[in-house]
Amino acid sequence: MANLSKIKRDQMIAFLESLKESHSDDASIQAFNEIENHIRDKKYGLVWEEHSEEVDDLLKENIPILTADPERRLCKDASLPWNFIIEGDNLQALYLLGKTHKGKVDCIYIDPPYNTGARDWKYNNDYVDGSDVYRHSKWLSMMKNRLLLAKNLLNPADSVLICTIDEKEYLRLGCLLEEVFPDARIQMVSVAIHSSGVARSEFSRTDEYYFFVFVGASAPVAVPLGLEWQSDGTKRQQDVRWESMLRSGNNGRRIDRPNLFFPALFEESTGEFLGFDKPVPLEVSGADYIPPLGAIAILPYASDGSEACWRISAKKALELKSIGAFDWSPIKDGKTTLKYLKPGELEKIEKGEYQVVGHKENGAMIVSAENYSPKWVPGTQWHVPTHQAGGAGGSSLIKTVLKTKRFDFPKSLYAVRDTLRFMTANKPNAIIVDFFAGSGTTFHAVNLLNAEDGGNRKCIMVTNNEVSVNEAKELKEKGYKPCDDEWEKYGIAKFVTWPRTVCCIEGHDVDGDSLKGTYTTSLGTEIKCSDGFKANVKFFKCGWTPRKPEDYLLSNALCLHIKEMIELQNAIEVDNVKNVLILNKEDFRRTILNADVRPQIERVWVNQNIIFSTEELKALKEIGYKYIPREFFGQELREAAE
């Protein structure tokens, strides 16, 4: 079958080649080459009109930098790692995270704009609404640029990107994820978030979708789950499973495993177990086997009366009997059921998940699973009451903490907690990034998860400081404009994300009153909201510095922001006591040569451009030090010829 599109492309390219022969000047050749490149562009899969952003233009002439906000810092426990909220365009932040966290992130969770047509997100400082004919192209351009940078952060051996979306863009998002992550395994989960449905002219929307992009060996972890995960209200099997010794199904015939067709012998009068006899020769029928005098022989027969085989050997069965892991039912009409505990069940006993509460007369263990919570991975449809966006973990929680409705459509705390739990239950020190942070649910969920299992997961959230449409209108009517202090005060980073984070860690609302109620843990227990969480968090703001300054050295400008990069990369606070940054000789004298500070120093970072004497280097080596990583701004300095 002819590829008509390819034939047409080849014809156009051949025509361009002929034009090149008659128009050989540089301008014409350059124009022809651009036309040819466009003709050869991808013509299949997800194709859209790519749009540029103002931030792209800013990146060409400027370098993103971070500056700590000294008024927004919360230390609850100095022994714990630090978390970070970064205010700024997420393209800026991802550029910097690519320098501090390349290949180090375990989980990225994002809840991007759903592009519903409402005025809920901006492209180049303008709201994108339903009347914009390029709204899908703008959304895809915005997402692709960020996903490409985010991909660079993920641990290639084992990590996951989770992206939530609804029906407006899920088809395009799925194609985009396949394009950006061609080697990943991608799965979509449906999550019920509105049991009553969102009213519309079509079917009411009750759910949204979570894309899981599994990188490397990443996979969801089987974890204990409560009954709310059972849509039909029934329990998952929690009883101790004694496996029947009779094999069924594939390879279950005697002819398949002739060595496993052997008799189990019992005392005829008492039913006492006597042991096993040798396998019956294949040419001898089981019916012709004659047991020892006074014994009953139990041979493996299928339910249809045909000769079958056992699952395990006589030797293995006796080994299990010696530890109480082999059992049988009372003999009735010359029949009994042999059973044993498989390795998985024995492991649960060893771990204390099952309890041995006694032994039967035949020596078999009596095992209780009363306190055991089975571990499993759910299916792709989640109907969990706590995942409701308008419930106690969603908008109601936001209003309780912030006292007013400062944010529309927050995710349920428990939906995010459960999502992160499936991917990081086996990673208590995971690094989690959310670069569409919004109301700050992700960090809240990380704190709750850490409180549940004692983990030290770290979270980096990125959000801009946009005000809502209504707030912008009110502020403009009062004469305020973007960048005014009064305007910035009501931006989402400062008005929602930060205060929610502080309140939830400290256990009070924005008025200072203790939070009422409890958090429900994954296993159904409760944690008082007023107890808060043990966590530390810093607030950074993205800024710019020119790539080629005229009146000063770029290296001097960048040195002012190295501290934040080191803190972000290492989840620490550079306090110049415990963690020390040496940018010049004065820093060296104030710390390394300070008899009061030196004994407290644990880690040191040094500017490579400082020339130290032999004695000074010796003092540094005694403590141990690292040079400021070249990957921070080495490329930018080379471009500036520094």
What are the language-model segments listed below?
Residues 1-55, 310-319, 324-355, 593-595, ...:
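Coupling/switch/interface segments within P-loop NTPase motor domains and analogous charged loops
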Residues 143, 157-159, 166-233:
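Signature of N6-adenine DNA methyltransferases within the class I
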